[in-house]
Amino acid sequence: MATTNVEENKQTQEQQPKEIKHQEVGHKSLLQSDALFQYILETSVYPREPEPMKELRDITAKHPWNLMTTSADEGQFLNMLLKLINAKNTIEIGVYTGYSLLASALALPDDGKILAMDINRENYELGLPVIQKAGVAHKIDFREGPALPVLDLLIEDAKNHGSFDFAFVDADKDNYGNYHKRLIDLVKIGGVIGYDNTLWNGSVAAPADAPMRKYVRYYRDFVMEFNKAIAADPRVEICQLPVGDGITLCRRIS
């Protein structure tokens, strides 16, 4: 029996490869399945997300630069990590609206401190009312401006060497190497440094001529260079995780 036009069209469609999600490098989640990422969020993250973090996430979602924010699953991860290592004195470079900062502040004891640095105070002030309402603003020492001069000033005082339990970097990728040179002196032996975006939207494993958003392509080589350098640094143990946009944890051992 001859097939109908409808059947022929159906067979043709079935033979064609299905559209692959996230073909363009630049998607926020590294997971190839949106459904799987949504499952993680709805099953494990959102039900346990503190109300202040949910409120700040909703505020940030309306901001035009919202792609810069820490993902909810990574916020949960940071909060758990700080509790596991009993962090008390920390550094955060790159704040944006403060979602990761709030996750950290909620994890620290009441007398814990976070030295937070960002070049844009206006973005930080979007989330500040939520941070204040959560009762953790007293833990945060916010400095507006480039982080390197602040770190250099800290290093000048020997008392600051090895005085921090944890540092989180989510800022200009072309300066990650410069941040590491300084943080390795400021974080104690046994302390941890977390570098965000080290898988950089998956671009680190993509061909150089793959379709990418301009900002992804611009920073791709900087991220790849940093990843190679940190993998060869004998002063730290490292673990690179595909959480959020990729986070590399460095535990200082010497």
UniProtKB/Swiss-Prot annotation:
GO terms for biological process: lignin biosynthetic process; methylation. Substrate binds at K28, D170, N201. It comes from Mesembryanthemum crystallinum (Common ice plant). Residues 1-25 are annotated as: Disordered. Keywords: Lignin biosynthesis, Metal-binding, Methyltransferase, S-adenosyl-L-methionine, Stress response, Transferase. Methylates caffeoyl-CoA to feruloyl-CoA and 5-hydroxyferuloyl-CoA to sinapoyl-CoA. Plays a role in the synthesis of feruloylated polysaccharides. Involved in the reinforcement of the plant cell wall. Also involved in the responding to wounding or pathogen challenge by the increased formation of cell wall-bound ferulic acid polymers. This is Caffeoyl-CoA O-methyltransferase. Coiled coil: none annotated.
